[in-house]
């Protein structure tokens, strides 16, 4: 019987735990404050930012919005980040991506104080993950590890295949699985005989940005399949990188889209916000 991994349920549990940790800090006179920076008026970005603000409100985290016009220059954005870095009342800084053309995203990410980098994108935090030190970890991969652990899915000793090598998901995902003692293979657009590789996977994480690309022929019986993708099909319905109906019956566990990995990303962002404060107060 296939287990449908419920990201909404687990994300709610994590947000409740974060809420308790925030309350404990408040009892000691310590607030948690996240600065949310949005440049331009991209509708999808506005939705994501609003969802993050709602999660902050639920968890008792203060959120401060900095909504800048599309015409904002890179220098102006970097100046704001510098001010937020130096503001002791700000614990976390989130710059909503993508940024308008003409602004170097890497430069902006690198300008954020690593201790306030709640997205976990700064090279210092990525490096800490690489060498096994404590740091703020990219939210989506961290959320996937939480899903696996809370569903008692063993990673140690398992063949883990990650499809996709992005800095936001693929690479940190591989490092986190390695940290949990999985045997990890990363596939990408130049991988030969992709099916031969994916059919070895006990745990298959798919983050390639192609709707319903992975069907049942890519998956071995009893595998755990984690779908990171999110798209709208021709009918306007949400779907992932995995063809859920084709794959589901072959798996022992699978994340749906929506309601799988997506909610975990915001829950782990909230976790990083409170961790940024706890790391300073220890």
Feature annotation, model-predicted:
Residues 95-155:
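Anion-binding alpha/beta catalytic cores of soluble intermediary-metabolism enzymes, centered on
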Residues 56-70, 184-186:
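Short beta-strand elements in bilobed, periplasmic/extracellular small-molecule ligand-binding domains
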Residues 1-30:
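Positively charged, low-complexity intrinsically disordered leader regions
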Residues 76-88:
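Short, well-structured alpha-helical segments in soluble
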Residues 96, 207-208, 228:
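Short, well-ordered coil/turn residues at beta-beta hairpins
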Residues 41-53, 101, 135-224, 233, ...:
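Glycine-rich phosphate/diphosphate-binding loop of Rossmann-like nucleotide-binding domains
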Residues 32-40:
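Short beta-strand segments enriched in small/hydrophobic residues
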Residues 106-119, 126, 229-280:
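Rossmann-fold NAD(P)-binding glycine/threonine-rich loop
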């Amino acid at each position: 019987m296939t287990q449908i991994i419920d990201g909404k349920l687990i994300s709610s549990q994590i947000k409740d735990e974060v809420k308790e940790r925030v309350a404990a800090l408040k009892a000691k006179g310590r607030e948690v404050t996240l600065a949310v920076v949005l440049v331009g008026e991209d509708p999808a970005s506005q939705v994501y930012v609003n969802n993050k603000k709602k999660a902050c409100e639920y968890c008792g985290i203060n959120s401060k919005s900095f909504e800048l016009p599309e015409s904002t220059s890179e220098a102006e954005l970097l100046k704001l980040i510098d001010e937020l870095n130096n503001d002791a009342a700000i614990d976390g800084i989130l710059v909503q991506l993508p940024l308008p053309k003409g602004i170097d995203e890497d430069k902006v990410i690198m300008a954020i104080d690593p201790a306030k980098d709640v997205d976990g994108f700064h090279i210092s935090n990525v490096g800490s993950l690489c060498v096994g030190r404590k740091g703020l970890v990219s939210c989506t991969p961290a959320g996937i590890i939480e899903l696996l652990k809370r569903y008692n899915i063993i990673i140690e000793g398992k063949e883990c295949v990650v499809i996709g090598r992005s800095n936001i998901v693929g690479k940190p995902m591989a490092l986190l699985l390695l940290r949990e003692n999985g045997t990890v293979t990363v596939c990408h657009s130049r991988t030969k005989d992709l099916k031969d590789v994916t059919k070895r996977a006990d745990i298959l994480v798919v983050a390639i940005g192609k709707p319903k690309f992975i069907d049942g022929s890519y998956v071995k019986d009893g595998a755990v399949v984690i779908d990171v993708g999110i798209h709208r099909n021709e009918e306007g319905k949400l779907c992932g990188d995995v063809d859920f109906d084709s794959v589901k019956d072959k798996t022992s566990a699978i994340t749906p889209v929506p309601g799988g990995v997506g909610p975990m990303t915001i829950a782990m962002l909230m976790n990083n916000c409170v961790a940024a404060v706890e790391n300073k107060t220890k």
